[in-house]
Design a protein with these regions (language model features):
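An acidic-aromatic substrate-binding cleft motif
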Residues: 1-19
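Structural helix-adjacent loops and short alpha-helical linkers that scaffold large soluble proteins
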Residues: 22-23
Length: 119
C-alpha cells in the first residue's frame, strides 16, 4: 500500500542562487544552513547542484569529472557530507550533447553518467 506524503518533494537548486559560481564550500554551507535554520525539519530535504559543476571535457574513459578547483574533495565526499546532515544530494545533467552553459551533456553517455553519479 502506498502512502501519501503531507508535502511535495522540497529542496534547493544552486542555479538561482549561485549560477555559474558554485563550489564545495557553498554547497556545504547550504547544507549546514538547511539544518541550522530548521528548513530540514520543515521538510526540505534535497540539495541539488545545477550546471557548471564539471570540467569542460570528459575524462579519457568518457566520464564526467568534477571541476577540481570548485570541488577539490570530489563529489563522493561532498555527497557524503550532505547525507551526513540527513539530506539528499542531487547533481544536474542534461539530456542533450551539452548543458545550457556549454558543459558536457549526457546524450549517448546516459549509462556511464548514471554509473558515475551512483558512485
Amino acid at each position: 500500500m502506498k502512502t501519501i506524503k503531507s508535502t511535495p518533494p522540497m529542496g534547493w537548486n544552486s542555479w538561482n542562487t549561485f549560477g555559474f559560481y558554485i563550489n564545495e564550500d557553498l554547497i556545504k554551507s547550504t547544507a549546514d544552513f538547511f539544518v541550522e535554520s530548521g528548513l530540514k525539519d520543515a521538510g526540505y530535504e534535497y540539495i541539488v547542484i545545477d550546471d557548471c559543476w564539471s570540467e569542460k571535457e570528459r575524462d579519457q574513459n568518457g566520464r564526467l569529472v568534477p571541476d577540481h578547483e570548485k570541488f577539490p574533495g570530489g563529489m563522493k565526499a561532498l555527497s557524503d557530507y550532505v547525507h551526513s546532515k540527513g539530506l539528499k544530494f542531487g547533481i544536474y545533467s542534461c539530456a542533450g550533447t551539452h548543458t545550457c552553459a556549454g558543459y558536457p551533456g549526457s546524450f549517448e553517455h546516459e549509462f556511464i553518467d548514471a554509473q558515475t553519479f551512483a558512485e
